[in-house]
UniProtKB/Swiss-Prot annotation:
GO terms for cellular component: cell outer membrane; transporter complex. Component of the lipopolysaccharide transport and assembly complex. Interacts with LptE and LptA. The lineage of its organism: Bacteria, Pseudomonadati, Pseudomonadota, Gammaproteobacteria, Enterobacterales. Disulfide bonds: none annotated. GO terms for biological process: Gram-negative-bacterium-type cell outer membrane assembly; lipopolysaccharide transport. Residues 1-24 form the signal peptide. It holds the Pfam family LptD_N. Coiled coil: none annotated. Its main location: membrane. This is LPS-assembly protein LptD. Keywords: Cell outer membrane, Membrane, Signal. Together with LptE, is involved in the assembly of lipopolysaccharide (LPS) at the surface of the outer membrane. The gene is lptD. It is found in: Cell outer membrane. Belongs to the LptD family.
Length: 787
């Protein structure tokens, strides 16, 4: 099985690439079978429009009635009725001065059409004043959209807004195709609300009833409507058979909710509840998933006696009165294995943590401030947790430009750090950072000279308990102090130039050459007396060569006496589309960077000179082909630290093939993520992958993804999906095999195998996509577009 999967995928991709048959757009194919209104559209009050009647023979009893016989054609506004015989009656109103009531009764091959619907039947009646129309034992077809059916009696009401069917049927399939239909004792189609209401509904597949409901709603457009959405089914080795039956609740124009009972035979019933809102302070989504009793988790979990699983997510973004900002990115789950066992849009087992961040801010012309609180839920063993929370954090920025030739920026921060572990230090940190910048620029060059002062005060607590904890391996723990002041100046000069020329081989292409050099000086300050609360060593890609800091946060500010140099070249076509770029650069250290922290790899290096090289490149061969790659070499490790490369062919959203490779050295992972205990990750990352999506034959589409870890000599992720699409239904099946955990006993990865099955009714909205993009993004290593 392991060997046949990539072979099958390669065969499918190879045959797709060399297929000589181009697929027509499915939406265009489907609309070929839908009638269109091609007469000039008449506007105005229908009651004031004239009635034109043509017939072979006319008999009249003026002004009460008239009979038209043979090839009768009646037209008023956008409506036309034809029949073999029509009787026109006119009833004088009871109130003098009112409009007479005019009705017609048509028999024999009756045909009615307007800009919304076509009706056919042996007999019809119509009120020309109200446009109410009845057709007996006839068929109907929507105009300009999919939807047709038949009924014992069809009634048009409220200026054709409603079509009411007695013992009627509805399907979005084209004429001649009865793959599915819904029949009911009464069917009401509301064109304004874009919904069909069906009483005593029987859902049929190929004429065979498979489902009954006393009441059913179907959307017949893109407008939001309350009702059940299409169910989804899948099977996996971890969860068993899964069935999702979402219900959409259109609460108000600015509020809606989706409630999804999610049956998992191995775990139980999970309730997934999503609420969306749009208000004056902003828009957001609240998700609450609840699994009251997870039988599978109760058997496998050894650390938690509670088998209740839940997820809470709140995402919000908004601006009020153009000055106030409100943001929320809050996700919390019941346990560390939640994303390993259960699927969710708000997290993945590969993330390693979720964030709980709330913030509010105020911004004016020259200053802004943000008050926030930030927590992390890290998925690791309880004994190794060392996670800090910023509760709260206040950030203030003040800008004043054009103070003579310089610009001024003042940054301030106050934050309180607490830890989930009671034996870890806690701190209050105050930081002030004034900056003066002298910008000089013309058309082809810029030179920015910057000077700043970094002043930080720490008040650290709980140090005695931290030093007494035997599980702590921090070599700096005895050097920590309760009160620490750190003041550091920083000086930086950053120069850029841009040279431009027309290409020798084509004047339609323009090439730029952009050299850059930056000198950075920060004096050394011993920071071993400061615990690390929010600082981690950052990776150094090409843009990272020109950062001020080696660490995120403020706890570690490395000394610097270095120059970073780099050069970028770009090629633009005559439409100013970037077709190619390449960048390469390095950092040369006159003195090795230090922080005084003996726990960090940065302080363990004694080397000066050129230590870090980084480069990246991009080539857009044409509108369909693109190549992207990057490489980082670290002399301190004497090896390539990071690398990635992507080759992609993308004709459109449904036709693409991507080859990719990513690499991270074991030394780099140990330096960047020293707390990672997963031995599968400690040995480094070297993964090659292929992702493909292609329609292989008419209306069939295949997607696949295969990632292989060359370090572990095992597949990292396998995904294949097949979808068949018609104008009125689609079906897809998929298989995924992914790594979910590391087994320390067997020293191997654990896998989950999942088979999914999904049926979708088409033609009810304007979506005719093949669904390839959705399947590709469902994997644990989702597809990411390269260009």
């Amino acid at each position: 099985m392991k060997k046949s999967f990539p072979t099958l995928l390669a065969t499918l991709v190879w045959s797709a690439l060399y297929s000589q048959h181009a697929l027509a757009d499915l939406a265009e194919q489907c609309m070929l079978g839908v009638p269109t209104y091609n007469r000039p559209l008449v506007t105005g009050d229908p009651n004031q429009l004239p009635v034109n009647i043509q017939a072979d023979k006319t008999e009249a009893n003026y002004p009460d009635n008239a009979k038209f016989i043979g090839n009768v054609n009646i037209q008023q506004g956008n409506s036309i009725m034809t029949a073999e015989q029509v009787e026109l009656s006119q009833l004088d109103p009871a109130t003098q001065g009112s409009t007479p009531t005019r009705t017609i009764t048509a028999t024999g091959k009756v045909h009615y059409d307007d800009n919304q619907v076509i009706l056919k039947g042996p007999k019809a009646w119509a009120n020309l004043n109200t446009k109410d129309t009845d057709v007996y034992e006839g068929d109907y077809q929507m105009v300009g959209r999919q939807g047709r059916g038949s009924a014992d009696k069809m009634k048009m009401r409220d200026s054709n807004r409603y079509t009411i069917l007695e013992n009627g049927s509805f399907t979005s399939c084209l004429p001649g195709d009865n793959s599915w239909s819904v029949v009911g004792s009464e069917v009401i189609q509301d064109r304004e609300e874009q919904v069909a209401e069906i009483w005593n509904a029987r859902f049929k597949i190929g004429g065979v009833p498979v489902f009954y409901s006393p009441y059913l709603q179907l959307p017949i457009g893109d407008k939001r409507r309350s009702g059940f959405l299409i169910p989804n089914a899948k099977y996996g080795s971890s969860n068993g058979f899964e069935l999702l039956t979402p219900y959409y609740w259109n609460i108000a124009p600015n509020f809606d909710a989706t409630i999804t009972p999610h049956l998992q035979t191995k775990r139980g019933m999970q309730w997934q509840n999503e609420f969306r809102y749009l208000t004056t302070p902003g828009l957001g989504v609240i998700q609450f998933d609840w699994l009251p009793s997870d039988s599978e988790y109760a058997k496998t979990s050894q650390q938690d006696n509670n088998d209740t699983r839940w997820l809470l997510h709140w995402g919000h973004s908004g601006v009020m009165d153009q000055v106030w900002r409100f943001d929320a990115d809050y996700t919390k789950v019941s346990d560390d294995r939640y994303f390993t066992d259960l699927d969710s849009h708000y997290g993945s087992t590969t993330d390693g943590y979720v964030t709980q961040k709330l913030s509010t801010g105020y911004a004016n012309q020259n200053w802004n401030t943000t008050l926030s609180t930030r927590q992390f839920q890290v998925f690791s063993n309880a004994t190794s947790r060392d996670v800090y929370r910023a509760e709260p954090q206040l950030d203030i920025n003040y800008y004043q430009n054009d103070i003579g030739p310089v610009d001024m920026h003042l940054y301030g921060q106050a934050v309180k750090f607490t830890n989930v572990n009671d034996n870890r230090p806690e701190a209050t940190r105050l930081h002030v950072e004034p900056t003066l910048n002298l910008p000089l620029a013309n058309r082809w060059a810029s030179l920015n000279t910057e000077a700043k002062l970094l002043a930080t005060h720490y008040q650290q607590d709980n140090l005695d308990r931290y030093r007494a904890d035997p599980t702590v391996s921090d070599v700096n723990k005895n050097a920590l102090q309760s009160s620490v002041n750190r003041v550091m100046p920083q000086y930086k000069v950053d120069g850029k130039m841009v040279f431009e020329r027309e290409m020798d081989w084509s004047q339609a292409y323009t090439q730029t050459l952009e050299p850059r050099a930056q000198y950075l000086y920060v004096p050394y300050r011993d920071q071993s007396s400061i615990h690390t609360y929010d600082s981690t060593l950052m990776q150094t890609d090409y843009s990272g060569l020109f950062r001020d800091r080696s660490y995120s946060g403020l706890d570690r500010i490395a000394s610097a006496n270095q120059i970073a140099t780099g050069v970028t070249t770009r090629i633009y076509d005559d439409a100013l589309v970037e077709r190619f770029n390449a960048s390469i650069g390095q950092i040369y250290y006159f003195d090795r960077p230090r922080t005084g922290d003996r726990n960090t790899s940065l302080d363990k290096s004694d080397n000066n000179g050129s230590q870090v090289w980084a480069g990246d490149s991009f080539l857009k061969i044409d509108d369909s082909w693109g190549v992207r790659g990057g490489l980082q070499y670290d002399n301190r490790l004497n090896e390539v630290a990071l690398g990635d490369a992507v080759l992609e062919y993308r004709r459109d959203a449904e036709r693409l093939v991507q080859l990719n490779y990513r690499y991270a050295s074991p030394e780099y992972i140990r330096d960047m993520l020293p707390n990672v205990t997963n031995q599968g990750s400690q040995q480094g990352i070297s993964q090659v992958g292929v992702t493909a999506s292609w329609p292989i034959v008419e209306r069939w589409a295949v997607v696949g993804a295969y990632y292989y870890d060359t370090k572990a000599n095992q597949p990292a992720n396998q995904l294949i999906g097949l979808q068949y699409n018609t104008c009125c239904w689609a079906v897809s099946v998929g298989y995924e095999r992914k790594i979910t955990d590391w087994n320390s006993a067997s020293r191997s990865s654990e896998y989950d195998n999942k088979v999914s099955f999904n049926i979708e009714l088409r033609g009810l909205s304007s979506n005719y996509g093949l669904g390839s993009d959705k399947m590709l993004r469902s994997g644990i290593l989702p597809y990411q577009r390269a260009f």
